[in-house]
Amino acid sequence: MSPATESFRMWAEDEKVYGPVDISTLVQWIQDDRVLPETFVQPQSDPCWRRAEDIETLREKFPVAAQVAAAEVGRGASSVAEALHEFPFFAGLTNEGLEQIAALGKAYEVAPGDLIVQQGDACDAVYFVLSGKLRVRLIIGAVDRIDKTLCKLARGEFFGELGMFLQSKRTADVIAETQSRLFRMNTNAFQLLVKQIPELASPVLFNIGATMARRVAEDNQRLYQEVTSQFVWG
C-alpha cells in the first residue's frame, strides 16, 4: 500500500482510538501537536501499534532530533525483544509478540549514579533491567539522611509494576550502580496493550498476577521469620 492511500489509527492520551484517517490528516495532527513523536499509531497495513517516530513515513514529519532518536531505537528493537525472553512477565509469548511489546516501550542507557526513579514520584511506568545492576535505596531522616539499601536489581529483574497498577507514589529511590540498560513501558502504553491487544495482554496480566502473589508470599515469609526470631523459646 502506498503512503498516499495508507490510513492510520491513533491511540490518544485520553486512552481512546481516533481514526482511521489518511496521511494528510495525520500530518496535520502532527503540526497541531495532537500527534507527538511518542504517540502510538497503527498503520492499516501493519497490525502492530508503534510510536509515530518509529514509522518511516511519519518520521520525517518530526524535528531532526526526533528522527535521529527514532532511528537509534529502531536499530535496537530486535535486541530488546530477545532480552525480554528472560522476564516472567512475558513468558509464553512468541517472537512476534515480544517484538510488539518492544515497540510499546523504550530502551535506554543509564550511567553509574544516575537516579532512575525518586521516592515520592508518581508511578507512571514499569522498568525492566536488560543489563547492569541497580540499587533500591531509602533515605531515612530529613537531617541525618541515612542511605539504606533495600535490595539490588540485576539483569532479568523489574520494578514499578505494583505502583503503576495502584497509581501510587514511588516508595524508594532506584539508582544505577553500574552502566545499565533499561526497558521502560509507561502507563499509557500498558493501557494500549490491555485495551487494544488482548491476545498479548491476557498472558502478560496472568504473569503479573503470579509474580505479585509470589512476592507477597515471600514478604510474608520474611516478616514471619523476623517476628519469630525475636522470641527465645524454652
Residue ranges and their predicted role:
Residues 1-104, 109-112:
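Protein-protein interaction regions
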Residues 7, 133, 179-181:
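Structural motif
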Residues 20, 92, 126-128, 152, ...:
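Short aromatic/basic micro-patch
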Residues 51, 57-60, 149-205:
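Cyclic-nucleotide recognition modules
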Residues 68-82, 97, 170-171, 188-228:
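A small-molecule sensor/coupling module
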Residues 113, 124-141, 155-156:
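Glycine- and acidic-residue-biased ligand/ion/polar-headgroup-sensing regions
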Residues 116-121:
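Short phosphate-coordinating micro-motif centered on Lys-Gly-acidic
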Residues 141-147:
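Short, solvent-exposed loop/turn segments that connect beta-strands within catalytic domains
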